[in-house]
Amino acid sequence: MQYTHPVLHMEKVCRSYKAKGIKRNVLSDLSLDIHPQEIVCLLGPNGAGKTTTVKIASTLLLPDSGTVEICGVDAVRQPRKACEHLSLLLGGEDGFYLSASAVDNLLFFAQVSGVPLIKQKALINEALVKVNLFEVRDQPVRTFSRGMRQRLHIARTLVAQNSLILLDEPTTGLDPESASGVRQLISELRHVPSGILLTTHTMREVELLADRVVVIQDGKSIFKGTLEEMRNSVEINHVSTYLAHAVSEDQIKKLKEQVGGSSVEVLDKCDSYYIDVAWTVSVPNELDERMFTWKKVNERNPSLEEVYLGLLSGRRKKDER
């Protein structure tokens, strides 16, 4: 993929809050770039700084220090000018005039975004067709389901035709069918063409959409790269699944001491247990038969979720640190 200048450039961004007189660093020297026609997924545990990053990128928050540029515009010094180039979609269904129709809402946002009057009707109709809402365009938004409102949010970004799209957990709370439809629409936003920053907790979403991934923890970036680079960055060799009819706390404790606590997952299925063990090159890749009489039933490559958890627990390859 050929990249031009970034639509979003963040360099050494810091942000802190004060609560009860105590300063808490939320972002520490965070840097990232988003280019046209790519989707970058921002991952991290709750409280890692994902939403703060999106708010700073959207000019809703000012950084304490660092550089934020949107399409070359200094977003700290010229936030209004920078906003002309971006669309923000926060997880949830708010943000519309509920008593107004879908068309009237999009007309309002088109005017706010500075879309030329002569183009508004055609762009709105085209967007409503793409998100499968054209047939209900004249209905009040209050009659729309949560999934329909999320699709209307995406229609709003299509009408605005902005270079940067910020999506903060856009499929949160949606049923599987609605979430799948929203993911398909997000994938098609590449052709606008726009650069997209997407926060999510759903690894399936990352696998389907991400061109690159940024993982943050405690406000700091701990990984940047493609999905393949992410998979290759941890020490996890493979994952073995064992079947047991009884599991003691002592067994699990010993196993976690051997391979690390985040590398063991136990699933209780009534009269049996399935134990997933993520092995690394630095430990023996088999159980001690004197202590464990479990039966191995499967061996596979680590899932993206297991790779992600490995990153968070510090299990990166030494040459990647």
Give the residues covered by each predicted segment.
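A short, flexible loop at the N-terminus of ABC-type nucleotide-binding domains that lies
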Residues: 2-10, 16-29, 79
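Walker A (P-loop) phosphate-binding loop of ABC-type ATPase nucleotide-binding domains
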Residues: 44-49
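Catalytic Walker B motif of ABC-type/P-loop ATPase nucleotide-binding domains
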Residues: 165-169
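ABC transporter nucleotide-binding domain
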Residues: 183-275
